[in-house]
């Protein structure tokens, strides 16, 4: 069962460009990189050379005689004489290149040679990426891949493009969903949120029609992350990295969701955990939401370095890390319980990052003015409020009406609500979050 992914169109566009460079695909483990690359290769090439450096150690010495195309291809065929290189008809797939990052140095030669298309990928590229980047600067294209978003989940469920496009139409026309539409999309979004976007987890759910077995798969992925820390986190305290990661659910459950090191360990200090958060971000496991000094443009230079929130990159993995009672209530009764606010924020943060948005929030100390997210468009700043209830959006109204904040002309509220508009505030259901960038583009905000 192959799931249609957004990278599919990108790969076709990449190949269609007559001057395309070698491609490096980055992303966390088990998000479907290899499946998508192989699917593309089988559809478009007569000859595929697939090398997995994690599983096939015989290929680790292919650079022994240099980085030129002739030496590399010769050593590959020495390691496996069944491999053939057919100019203009072959694609070379280097997988798990974090195990052999110097392979990136060959991309310059392959680019100049022009006889073979090359795609590199790996689960922990963020960690070794500075080394990989310096080895291939000017000779590659980067693509960051994520776990499945809500739209990809709907594709996997069999929904047609026009059905999915209707969500954006409702937003643009400010037209409320009817009761049936709202109920169905809310149910689908809640199922997606519980599952997350890991393809193996989604596949298990679609094959059985239930959540049975999905939690075991999610728990294994989190255990695999622990192993990655122990294997790849050189020069850092591995136990502290794992402790930071495991503390995030409790951090988000606080009323003040700002990340605090004293919640990781008693009397912990930020300097003791230097590099731990960056490691998790580079691995594609977590997201960082920066606190703005002022809710205004520009965003660069307008960040309070010591204030931030951390979210899981995949909300399904966040849910799988909750206590057993909360998980059971959510999976069986669809009740988010005390974690409601935290989960809704993580849903939205994940949707934003997968659309290419940066994450920013604002909280004024010793004051009630705060906002969950801000989205930057071409010349405006859009505050986005995530409400676990239908209460009035006082902070949004205050930001919009304050003449000091000239960059803000309207706001967006995402909640357990229908489509609506009042007092410069657009209201959308949570499941609309994945369409926000398209919505703003259609409104000519970009």
Residue ranges and their predicted role:
Residues 1-16:
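N-terminal pre-Walker A segment at the start of P-loop NTPase domains
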Residues 33:
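Conserved lysine of the Walker
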Residues 36, 40:
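Hydrophobic positions on the alpha1 helix immediately C-terminal to the Walker A/P-loop
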Residues 44-59:
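Conserved catalytic segments around the Walker B and adjacent sensor/switch elements
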Residues 55-87:
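Short glycine-rich substrate-engagement loop in P-loop NTPases that contacts/grips substrate
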Residues 117-123, 144:
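Structural recognition of the conserved hydrophobic beta-strand(s) that form the central parallel beta-sheet
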Residues 130-253:
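Interdomain motor-coupling "hinge/lid" segment immediately C-terminal to the ATP-binding subdomain
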Residues 203-370, 374-378:
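Accessory nucleic acid-recognition modules appended to NTPase machines
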């Amino acid at each position: 069962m192959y799931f249609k992914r957004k990278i599919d169109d990108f790969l076709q566009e990449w190949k269609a460009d007559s001057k395309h460079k070698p491609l490096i695909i980055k992303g966390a483990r088990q998000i479907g990189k290899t499946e998508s690359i192989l699917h593309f290769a089988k559809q478009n090439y007569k000859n595929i050379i697939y090398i997995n450096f994690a599983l096939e150690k015989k290929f680790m010495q292919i650079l022994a005689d240099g980085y030129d195309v002739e030496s590399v291809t010769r050593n590959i065929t020495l390691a496996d004489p069944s491999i053939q290189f057919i100019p203009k008809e072959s694609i070379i797939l280097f997988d798990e290149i974090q195990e052999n990052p110097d392979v990136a140095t060959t991309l310059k030669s392959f680019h100049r040679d022009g006889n073979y298309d090359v795609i590199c990928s790996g689960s922990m590229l963020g960690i070794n990426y500075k080394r990989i980047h310096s080895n291939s600067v000017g000779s590659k294209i980067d693509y960051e891949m994520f776990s499945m978003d809500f739209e990809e989940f709907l594709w996997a469920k069999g929904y047609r493009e026009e059905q999915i496009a209707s969500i954006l139409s409702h937003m643009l026309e400010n037209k409320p969903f009817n009761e049936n539409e709202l109920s169905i999309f809310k149910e689908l979004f809640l199922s997606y949120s519980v599952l997350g976007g890991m393809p193996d987890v989604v596949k298990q759910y679609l094959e059985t029609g239930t959540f049975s077995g999905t939690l075991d798969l999610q728990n294994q992925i989190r255990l695999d992350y622990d192993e990655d820390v122990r294997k790849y986190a050189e020069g850092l305290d591995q136990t502290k990295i794992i402790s930071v990661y495991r503390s995030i659910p409790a951090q988000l459950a606080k009323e003040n969701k700002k990340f605090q090191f004293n919640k990781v360990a008693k009397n912990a200090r930020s300097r003791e955990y230097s590099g731990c958060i960056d490691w998790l971000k580079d691995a594609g496991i977590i997201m960082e939401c920066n606190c703005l000094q002022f809710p205004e443009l520009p965003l660069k230079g307008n960040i309070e370095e010591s204030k931030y929130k951390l979210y899981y990159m995949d909300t399904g993995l966040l849910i799988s890390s909750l206590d057993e009672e909360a998980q059971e209530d959510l999976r069986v009764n669809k009740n988010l319980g005390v974690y409601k606010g935290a989960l809704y924020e993580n849903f939205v943060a994940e949707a934003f990052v997968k659309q290419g948005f940066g994450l920013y929030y604002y909280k004024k100390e010793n004051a009630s003015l705060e906002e969950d997210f801000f989205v930057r468009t071409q010349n405006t700043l859009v505050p986005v409020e995530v409400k676990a209830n239908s209460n009035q959006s006082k902070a949004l109204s205050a930001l919009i009406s304050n003449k000091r904040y000239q960059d803000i002309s309207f706001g967006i509220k995402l909640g357990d609500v229908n489509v609506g508009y009042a007092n410069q505030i657009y209201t959308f259901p949570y499941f609309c979050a994945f369409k926000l960038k398209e919505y703003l583009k259609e409104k000519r905000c970009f």
